[in-house]
Amino acid sequence: MKKTFAILALGLTAIAGHAATPLWMRDVQISPDGTEIAFCYKGDIYKVPVKGGTATQLTTQESYECIPIWSPDGKQIAFASDRYGNFDVFVMPADGGTARRLTTHSTGELPSAFTPDGKYILFSASIQDPANSALFPTSAMTELYKVPATGGRTEQVLGTPAEAVCFDKAGQQFLYQDRKGFEDEWRKHHTSSITRDIWLYDAKTGAHTNLTNREGEDRNPVLSPDGRTVYFLSERNGGSFNVYAFPLAQPREVKPITSFKTHPVRFLSMSDGGTLCYGYDGEIYTQQPDATPKKVAIEIVRDDQPQFANLQPSDGATSATVSPDGKQIAFTLRGEVFVTSADYATTKQITHTPAREAGLSFAPDNRTLAYASERGGNWQLYLAKIARKEDPNFPNATLIEEEVLLPSTTVERAYPQFSPDGKELAFIEDRIRLMVLNLETKKVRQITDGSTWYSTSGGFDYSWSPDGKWFTLEFTGNKHDPYSDIGLVSAQGGGKITNLTNSGYMSGYPRFALDGNAILFTTERYGMRAHASWGSLNDAMLVFLNQDAYDKYCLSKEDYELRKELEKEQKKSAGKDTPKDENKDKKKKDDKKDSNTDKKDDQPKDIVVELKGIEDRVVRLTPNSSDMGSTIISKDGETLYYLAAFEGGYDLWKMNLRKKETRLLHKMNAGWADMQLDKNGKNLFLLGSRKMQKMDTSSDALTPITFQVNAKMDLAAEREYMFDHVYRQQQKRFYNTSMHGVDWDKMTAAYRRFLPHIDNNYDFAELLSEWLGELNVSHTGGRFYPKGQSEPTASLGLFFDWNYTGKGMLIAEVVEKGPFDTANTRVKAGTVIEKIDGVEITPDADYYTLLNNKARKKTLVSLFNPQTKERWEEVIIPITNGAFSNLLYARWVKQRAADVD
């Protein structure tokens, strides 16, 4: 996008029409006859002769295809595809051709194996635990299902996680790897009680036998053609994943088959003739168990083009700020800076880089914008200015000039904020120190020394006082990390932070209010506290910096009105005492001054700070604690606006501080949103990711703020930036200075070479997980969350009996507070659902299609009681699977409480 992109000519795409050697080939599986290998590359499925050569592309959709599974006769390949928003199981001819969709539930469904007779495909998915299951209800812990290879009703095989299934020839037993927890599957060298083990399941007896049972990773089992030997992947002997084997009858007699170093062996499979096949370091190998590995030489012909995306989003801002005059909104979206008009959709793109920009601040002149950018590998401060004086604002500007401030390759500077007079710029240095830059002299002074903030994940909240002489900030006192307090410190530098809260609990989001005479903040001191990192409930609080402001706040409505009248009279009296000639001159000056209230506001009074007794001037504003978002107090100091979530998203609440009256002002259902006032306090801006709106504070009327973005994104450059970002973050902030013995630079180079072979976010997230997995720490890895399901499956709030094979669906349990848990329903356990919206459910029917896109819509359910032979109908409103998940959690908590009563 910019000149920096020129260095990206490192082969990010293959030359059109020419054969290239692929890397990062995943989901490798050899055919049953051992002549071909199927694999996934760049989101498509290919196959190649086992001896190597040019691979044949089998899928050509824009969607992502992965996990090819051969049928026993080698004539079909099952695979996963996200063509409908989530991963479903499909099947296609082994030579390519039209694929048939087999699963329709909106959860992710990933194929594992064909049954030996080829009639069914087993897959893992989180659809429904058995009603009697005691497992924690989470989508991370899947169940095992099977679906006919020709299509039809899904049946549950196991109610517990069972991955990488491998059948014996008779189909009576199968091997599988378990899953006990949430650890990233690509983590390496992990030893704990939740690492995977290999199990043998006997379908006749229902018995599960743990064959490995150790605190280390053992996974991906395959059975030898004679059924006597288990081959699997393991990190035994202190190395990375390699192929090992043991006799099925004597699982303790483990021996190594391969001895690869540095990187893991992945995706083990075996042909009917006993040829092993697997992936290593992005390439494919075959091997006879008693021989040495052979790399399969592969070429792929692709007509790849440079990856650019033209994005035209209408929402999705990740941060936003309003200009002082209230006429412009600056926001970041996908890491770029944009400015839109508050009244029109006209929008200007300010930055064009693959790097991330963040931390927006308008100067008082409304023509200068400060932000931080990580371009060049280090967070730096930038100023964007409207170049031509003829251009009225950013959205309509023709030329934008950009300037980097205090350039450095080692010191990070971010989170800029202009001083009220626009002459200085505050910022956070190296994520822990508050600094101020004089924009004229370029001199920098230190406000805090970094000893009061310990987190390096980002900066901290701070705010200038209206007179520019103070900062309020969140800080950590007495090394009480991570519990932050609210502080006050001089903007001149060299001063100590005064702790204004001393609560011992989380306090944050400070901002000045009441013309700088008080500080508004939120705290969990009265609500649910984050003792175990399960979240907290907060209140809005004020700390008054002087007694006069506190006394004024404490006045009743009547006394407050009397005080305002008295102040008016005193002002008039002061005018009368002035000599006549001076009075005339003063009146002329006052008239001129009153004609421009903005100029008057530009000269704020000095704030009086009285620290003595300040601990007694801390006031709780909100009547009850809540999941609280942004808070702000009106210009006149009489109204508190705050965002709180009691059900669903965040809604806007309004509180009259004098009358102590609170009401729901607007139902917003917002994700995140920040609230800001324009300079005169006439408009309140609600700036969120889902929508941005402007509210007239006199009428409370909302007006939408729209924008028109047409941005061209270099996707390959974005991925390279993210890769570099991860490298730097780990290098700077990994808790262990030796990086757990990993040569981080060498490992980074090893994984960087795969970037040209990745053109989608699924593969990129997996690459990050593999790479970060080398460090062997929890809570790391890459994640990609697609936009969502195109056909979300609704829930009836029921458990079904998976052993039932007749017409309809047999209810095993009605979940409390679900759609059927009503006073008027006749539905109970044992009832059969025969039809949904008049469509009969036959024994072999896939009924999930009848529930897709039905959440929150009236649905007719036809029911039958096998005991009384009665039939009837009920109209219910299905819920989302997310809502059903919440009900299951409440049910699980009650059941576990009953277990210990």
Per-segment meaning from a language model:
Residues 255-269, 498-509, 622, 629, ...:
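Conserved blade-ending motifs and adjacent loop-strand segments that build the rim/top face
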Residues 19-25, 53-55, 301-317, 398-405, ...:
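A short helix->beta-strand "capping" segment at the edge of beta-propeller domains
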Residues 21-22, 40-46, 59-65, 78-90, ...:
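A flexible loop/linker signature enriched in serine peptidases of the S9 family
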Residues 756-807, 870-897:
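Extended, small/polar residue-biased N-terminal targeting/export presequences
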Residues 29-34, 68-76, 112-120, 165-173, ...:
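Blade-terminus and WD-like Trp-Asp/Gly-His loop motifs, strongest in beta-propeller folds
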